[in-house]
Structure formats: structure tokens, C-alpha cells
Amino acid sequence: MRIVSLAGGIGGARFLRGLKAAAPESDITVIGNTGDDITLFGLRVCPDLDTVMYTLGGGINEEQGWGRADETFTVKEELAAYGMQPQWFGLGDRDFATHIVRSQMLAAGYPLSAVTEALCDRWRPGVRLLPMTDDQTETHVVIEDERGRRAVHFQEWWVRLRASTPALEIALVGAASATPAPGVLEALERADVVILPPSNPVVSIGTILQIPGVRDAVAAKTVVGVSPIIGGAPVRGMADACLTAIGVETSAQGVLELYGADLLDGWLVAEEDAATSLEGVAVEARPLLMSSPEATRDLAAAALELARKVAA
């Protein structure tokens, strides 16, 4: 089976680990979100791509779900001693090496897709990991604070402000002129099924779908999504703040309607959200918490089984 999964960071990466276990013989391509990407200390940082790469490659900090295992922060401490900003984004020493390699390759003229492939040569994630685009796109958030109405990078809103300042608008800067990275549309064309894992529907999955041509290519296939909302609350993170910013209810129903019947064929929800429905979409209730490798594998298997049902 040829599977394509769109993915953000922690939730998407953990689901993908279960997907590999549920379909070990399948050809899996992952289209990763790059809207979170940011330049820090002169280095290009790709948080979601790296989280997928580290998680599937066995190098992730399992407790927090991002960053490297056995990490140290000597460089961060030294930068802080010099007064270098920003200090709210913590890059570890091992993580710095990834960003240095990426930035040197980008400066040498390699596209992000080629750089990502080279980085994965070390980590062997067991999937083909593609950025959604080679073009620089960044998610920015419009807020209003003591400095007035202004736009900040998504990472500043998410990490420094912890989404505590309401988002007035969320925009993917550069999306209109971006093109899918090499291999993205080809993978979607060949796919037997497309999976939308329980990643943030606004700034992860939604961002990928904003790249021209991607949503149409996804919608042409059998598509099953997994709700990132259980009982009216995000499984993790602050997806509720993102949904509120675009006027969508924080519920499995709200996210289902956001994606729409033109995109989804199947939708997995938690058992307490079993009443969720939308004409044209097959909805099934399953345990959604990825509380163990076995539970995560079973969730991925349920998504694939639903895909088989709706494709029949």
C-alpha cells in the first residue's frame, strides 16, 4: 500500500510511529509542515520536519516529544551570557548541529527537499520525508498588546507568549507564490490513501493544504483524518487558540466541518464524540489517546481500516 500522511510536529510524529507499526510493508511518504520554520542566530530551524525525523529515527526526547534525547544547552547558555536574543526559544547543542548542516546546505544552493533528504540519510526514519514546499513560507500571527496591533512569527506567539494573547489573524506568509516541493504532488498522485493525523488543523495540516495544488491533489484521493480534539479540548498543545482565531469551534465536529466533505472521506473521533457527523463523511469512534506504542499502532490501524471501508 502507498500511504501519504500530512504531518505537523509532536502529534503527527507519534502517529506516524504507530502507522509504521500498523503497516510495516507499506510505502509511506510524509509531507511535513514548514510554516513553523524560523531563522534563529543565522540558522534555519525546521521544528516540525526535525520532530518527525528525530521521532522516527530514534533520537527524540520522548518525555517532551520535541528536541533531542540526552540534550545539553551549553551554547544556549553562552549565547544568553552575551545577551543574544531571542532567549525564549531553546536550541540544544545536539540540535544546533542539525541546523548548522541545514543552513550551510541551503546557503550552498541546495533546496530544502534535498537538504531534508540528506539529513534523513543519517536518521533513517523509515519513511520518505518531504517538506511541503522548498519556498520560504512562515506562519505569522496578528496580535494586539501594549505595543499595539502587530504581526509576530508563529513561534513567538506559540513559545514565548504560549498563545495567551488572542490571535486576531493567522496567515501563511509566502503561500500564494509557493509551489509544492519536488515529489509532493507525485506522491499524492500515486497514493492509495492519504491520512491526516491528529496534528494542529490550522497551523500544521491547514498550512500544508494552503500550498497551491496540494488540497486538490489530496481531495482527489481516499482521505481519512484523525480528530485532534477529544471532548472539546485538544489532545495536546493549544489548537483551541488557533481554532478560535479562525472562528471554528473547538470540537471534533468543528474540525470535521473545517476540513469539509470535499476533502475527507472518513473521520475518526473519540468515543465521547461519537455523535459527530457530516453528510458524505464516514465517522467512526475509536480510542484516540496515543498513550502507548500499542494504542498508537491500533489507532493507525483503525484509520487504515476506515480508509479501506470508504474506498470499497
Q: What are the residue ranges of the model-derived segments?
A:
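C-terminal functional extensions of proteins
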Residues: 236-312
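An anion/phosphate-binding loop that grips the pyrophosphate of nucleotide cofactors and donors
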Residues: 191
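Active-site glycine-rich loop that binds ribose-phosphate moieties when present
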Residues: 168-187
